[in-house]
Curated annotation (Swiss-Prot):
The gene is gapN. The active site is at residues 263, 297. Catalyzes the irreversible NAD(P)-dependent non-phosphorylating oxidation of glyceraldehyde-3-phosphate (GAP) to 3-phosphoglycerate (3PG). It is highly specific for D-GAP. NCBIfam families: G3PDH_Arch. One of its GO terms (molecular function) is NAD binding. Keywords: Allosteric enzyme, NAD, NADP, Nucleotide-binding, Oxidoreductase. Alpha-D-glucose 1-phosphate binds at residues 72, 79, 154-155. AMP binds at residues 72, 79, 134, 154-155. It catalyses: D-glyceraldehyde 3-phosphate + NADP(+) + H2O = (2R)-3-phosphoglycerate + NADPH + 2 H(+); D-glyceraldehyde 3-phosphate + NAD(+) + H2O = (2R)-3-phosphoglycerate + NADH + 2 H(+). Belongs to the aldehyde dehydrogenase family. This is NAD(P)-dependent glyceraldehyde-3-phosphate dehydrogenase. Beta-D-fructose 6-phosphate binds at residues 72, 79, 184.
Length: 501
């Protein structure tokens, strides 16, 4: 892989590039060296240096004592200019960023390029976040207690925000969390996934080159357990976390009383009504299952089709999944690349076996093709047994979904709402009355009509209910989690309260 922006920052050791952490002012780290393996062939492609406990302490101290003020005191127009310049830098280096995403995250080239472009767009649209920063004026005329007073309500940055990012969008998620934290005047400490931390390092370098205050950002390459010290630290006022529900619950337990954006487990249901365009539904559902090998929180995991169209629908979805080419993502003809690790394939195969043992039938795929490669899979599940299956009860982060024939919309809604997650749902059909009923009753954060769920750059807000998280991400919507209200009350009663000159 090319060093790109990090040339001069990366050192080589035994022919392997070594990426440092960024410690709120300097690149470095004296902790352990952690191997970074490519999911393509499990070869070591880099190492990252984690900071020592003392370096973490010093970094948080810099962010808290200086960095949060550097970010807050920088005029909003200058913050916006920094983010726009960073977008230009990333865009100029698109090929290098995409190459790293292919090698480190195992994304097919087209998906990697798409993620880089999404990061660029997110940075350029930061000005839309500013539309949500306004406050309120409250006259005190309406209660005896507040007569001759008035109040102003304003939003202020919290200080230091911890951005904990997942492996599936290692560039975009880092850029997104940094963007909305910084545009509102916060300093940011980024803890990337240790599976693919390289894109986040490149993003931080682009931001620094664009003029980001050097003491207002940090990148700490820490394994999960060691990262708890960031979350638990009282100098960190908010945590923006994307990852599994289990880890998210641990983050809240360790972090205690502070503000959180939690984008957690998902896996979405897709409901197909009897009057749906079946070609459209099959196309969207298949793509929702296999895109980035199903390693997306908004991937389709449960297909619920009304009885008159069920047979044709699952036949078409199975046909599309069976036609996909699985393999090395560096090959432009490949549709589906590897899962992030062999253990992810193990989990998928165990879930398929569990489904078959409980009455399920594999309609497409179902075979392991290598340590990290697997066929996209559709499993037919009886309506009266599906709730017992791992595929229903848990989010299996892989290209696999179960399909259930339902007698009507109400049964579909009941099965969709029965899962512990509530991120998104898709509904395919033409009957406006039925669609409106689904919109009202589905317990999810977003509903996509005649489309697959896809959060994209967050142009529309996203986030879930139940075990899928709290608060929302998306342009302008994370303001709730990374700022605080401050109320200022003016008293005009009595003589000598105000001096007029």
């Amino acid at each position: 892989m090319r060093a790109g922006l990090l040339e001069g920052v990366i050192k080589e050791k035994g022919g392997v590039p070594v990426y440092p952490s960024y410690l709120a002012g300097e690149w470095g780290g004296s902790g352990q060296e952690i191997e970074v393996k490519s999911p393509i062939d499990l070869a070591t492609i880099a190492k990252v240096i984690s900071p020592s406990r003392e370096e973490v302490e010093r970094t948080l101290d810099v962010l808290f004592k200086r960095g949060r003020w550097s970010a807050r005191d920088m005029p909003g127009t200058e913050r916006l200019a920094v983010l726009r310049k960073a977008a230009d830098i990333i865009e100029r280096n698109l090929d290098v960023f995409a190459e790293v995403l292919v090698m480190n995250a195992g994304k097919p080239k087209s998906a990697a390029v798409g993620e880089v472009k999404a990061a660029v767009d997110r940075l350029r649209l930061a000005e839309l976040d500013l539309k949500k920063i306004g406050g309120d004026y409250i006259p005190g005329d309406w209660t005896y207690d507040t007569l001759e007073t008035e109040g102003l309500v304003r939003r202020e940055p919290l200080g230091v925000v911890a951005a904990i990012t997942p492996f599936n969008y290692p560039l975009f998620d880092a850029v997104n969390k940094i963007t909305y934290s910084f545009i509102y005047g916060n300093a940011v400490v980024v803890k990337p996934s240790i599976s693919d931390p390289l894109p986040a390092a490149m993003a931080v370098k682009a931001l620094l080159d664009a003029g980001f205050p050097p003491d207002a950002i940090a990148l700490l390459n820490l394994p999960g357990k060691e990262a708890e010290k960031i979350v638990a630290d009282d100098r960190v006022a908010a945590v923006s976390f994307t990852g599994s529900t289990e880890v998210g619950e641990r983050v809240v337990k360790v972090g205690g009383v502070k503000q959180y954006v939690m984008e957690l487990g998902g896996g979405d249901p897709a409901i197909v009504l009897e009057d749906a365009d079946l070609d459209l539904a099959a196309d969207k559902i298949a793509r929702g299952i296999y895109s980035y090998a199903g390693q997306r929180c908004d991937a389709i995991k449960l297909v619920l089709a009304e009885r008159p169209v069920y047979g044709k629908l699952v036949e078409e979805v199975a046909k599309r999944l069976s036609s996909l080419r699985v393999g090395d993502p560096r090959d432009p003809t490949v549709d589906v690349g590897p899962l992030i690790s062999p253990s992810a394939v193990d989990e998928m195969m165990a879930a398929i076996e569990d489904a078959v043992e409980k009455g399920g039938r594999v309609l497409a795929g179902g075979r392991r093709l290598g340590p990290t490669y697997v066929q996209p899979t559709l499993v037919e599940a009886p309506a009266d047994r599906v709730k017992d299956m791992v595929l229903y009860k848990r989010e299996v982060f892989a290209p696999v979904a179960s399909a259930v024939e339902v007698k009507d919309l109400d049964q579909a809604i009941e099965l969709a709402n029965g899962r512990p997650y509530g991120l998104d749902a898709a509904v395919f059909g033409r009957d406006v009355v039925k669609i409106r009923r689904a919109v009202r009753l589905l317990e999810v954060g977003a509903i996509y009509i005649n489309d697959m769920p896809r959060h994209g750059i967050g142009y529309y807000p996203f986030g879930g209910r139940k075990k899928s998280g709290v608060f929302r991400e998306g342009i302008g919507y994370a303001v709730e989690a990374v700022t605080a209200y401050k109320t200022i009350v003016f008293n005009y009663k009595g003589k000598g309260v105000w001096k007029y000159e």
